[in-house]
A protein has these predicted regions:
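Acetyl-CoA-dependent GNAT
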Residues: 15, 19-79, 85, 94, ...
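Conserved active-site tyrosine of GNAT-family acetyltransferases
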Residues: 119, 124, 147
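Terminal substrate-recognition subdomain of acyl/acetyltransferases
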Residues: 139-154
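Glycine-rich acetyl-CoA-binding "A-motif" of GNAT/NAT acetyltransferases
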Residues: 50-53, 114, 141
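Conserved catalytic-core motifs of GNAT/GCN5-like acyltransferases
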Residues: 59, 105-108, 125-142
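A short beta-loop-alpha structural element at the N-terminal edge
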Residues: 1-11
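Conserved acetyl-CoA-binding loop-helix of GNAT-fold acetyltransferases
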Residues: 80-95, 116-121
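Conserved GNAT acetyl-CoA-binding A-motif
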Residues: 97-107
């Protein structure tokens, strides 16, 4: 992800379906991600040379708890075509094979069946429901589904 990607990613994050999960775009926050000042390592997702989303990971480096978490959003016009599954699977392979993580986690909203299906296709398994896990932009709480993938399951 570069600073040049920020306007496109902000436009994608502002799409109603994406904003419902990620909140309205904050240019300063996206610019921080592009500059590498965010706690996550961030990549733009491209399809045929066009930026269509964002994928990021955050790491727990303590060797006793070696794991990473993944977050992703895609433009509404490319959802449902397998790109989310492919992107998450590619990131999982990188985090396990190159970064040495034992466990990966992802935590979609419990009602986001499309995302859950994509993550299951990438190899993630449901672990449990986290009640009132995250507050939506409108202020109401919603449950999250904790999913994980162990290195030997990849």
């Amino acid at each position: 992800m570069t600073a040049d990607d920020v306007p496109r990613l902000a436009a994608i994050q502002g799409q109603p379906g994406v904003a419902a999960a990620w909140g309205e775009p904050e240019l300063e926050k996206l610019a921080g991600k592009a500059a590498g000042t965010d706690e996550c390592t961030v990549f733009a997702v491209e399809l045929e040379g066009e930026v269509v989303g964002l994928v990021q990971y955050h790491e727990e480096d303590d060797p006793m708890y070696r794991h990473a978490g993944i977050d992703i959003f895609l433009s509404e016009d490319v959802q449902g075509r397998g790109l989310g599954t492919e992107t998450v699977r590619t990131m999982a392979e990188y985090l396990i094979r190159e970064r040495g993580h034992h466990r990966l986690v992802i935590d979609p909203a419990a009602h986001n069946t499309a995302a859950i299906r994509a993550y299951e296709k990438a190899g993630f398994k449901p672990v449990g429901v986290m009640r009132q896990y995250e507050r939506l932009p409108g202020g109401e709480w919603h449950d999250g589904l904790l999913m994980d993938l162990l290195a030997d399951e990849l």
